[in-house]
């Protein structure tokens, strides 16, 4: 009987040890996975981004598209983007920083302005980089439309537009049109970046 008890005790200990080892392995695996996920998110290793957020300056909301277009045309003549949204808001400029957009609104008390958030689904880091480069180039274009560097940068952006998963036909078409305008030295700055309404760097300064 004593031998049977000792044998059973040994089996029980081995079973307990095996369960403990399996549990420990599971904890280490899950802990490693969680740690890597947090590390990736915290240190920017993960290539994925849910949204890219921009802050647009809205200078008017209208009941009809015709009213909005008329107001937008006036803004374009002054150097603003004058972009009309689907819900008849007229946007004058856009920034990557909310505080910049708020400063523009507060520095232009003649308009009933407000900041509108624009979120664009940029799944990967390279898309986010292209968007930010696009904004920088277009702001430079408004300041110096005959710059050779601006023309080259716009050409490069159009060529890389296919890299963006979220690109629509209208967006690429507008970029192509904008490059044509810049190359022809068209004086109408209203052709700025209409799709993302990046323009008006001189019209609305921070």
Question: What do the predicted segments below correspond to?
Answer:
Residues 127-183:
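Charged/polar low-complexity intrinsically disordered segments, enriched in acidic residues
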Residues 71-78, 104-108, 157-160, 164, ...:
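Structured segments of extracytoplasmic/periplasmic soluble domains
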Residues 171-206:
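C-terminal amphipathic alpha-helix
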Residues 7, 18-19, 135, 197:
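Compositionally biased amphipathic helical and low-complexity segments enriched in hydrophobic
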Residues 21-23, 31-136:
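Solvent-exposed beta-strand motifs enriched in subsets of small alpha/beta binding domains
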Residues 1-14:
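N-terminal Lys/Arg-rich, disordered targeting/topogenic segments
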Residues 12-26:
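Membrane interfacial helix-start segments of signal peptides and signal-anchor transmembrane helices
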């Amino acid at each position: 009987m004593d031998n049977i008890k000792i044998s059973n005790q040994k089996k029980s200990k081995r079973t307990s040890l095996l369960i403990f080892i399996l549990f420990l392995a599971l904890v280490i695996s899950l802990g490693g996975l969680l740690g890597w996920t947090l590390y990736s998110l915290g240190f920017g290793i993960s290539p994925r981004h849910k949204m890219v957020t921009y802050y647009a300056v809205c200078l008017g909301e209208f009941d009809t598209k015709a009213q909005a277009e008329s107001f937008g045309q006036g803004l374009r003549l002054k150097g603003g983007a004058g972009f009309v949204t689907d819900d008849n808001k007229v946007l004058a400029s856009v920034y990557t920083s909310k505080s910049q957009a708020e400063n523009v609104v507060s520095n232009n008390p003649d308009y009933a302005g407000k900041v509108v958030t624009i979120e664009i689904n940029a799944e990967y880091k390279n898309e986010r980089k292209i968007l930010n480069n696009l904004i920088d180039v277009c702001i430079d274009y408004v300041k110096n439309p005959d710059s050779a560097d601006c023309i080259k940068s716009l050409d490069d952006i159009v060529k890389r537009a296919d890299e963006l998963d979220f690109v629509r036909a209208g967006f690429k078409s507008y970029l192509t049109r904008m490059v044509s305008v810049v190359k022809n030295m068209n004086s109408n700055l209203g052709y700025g970046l209409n799709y993302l309404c990046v323009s008006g760097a001189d019209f609305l300064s921070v």
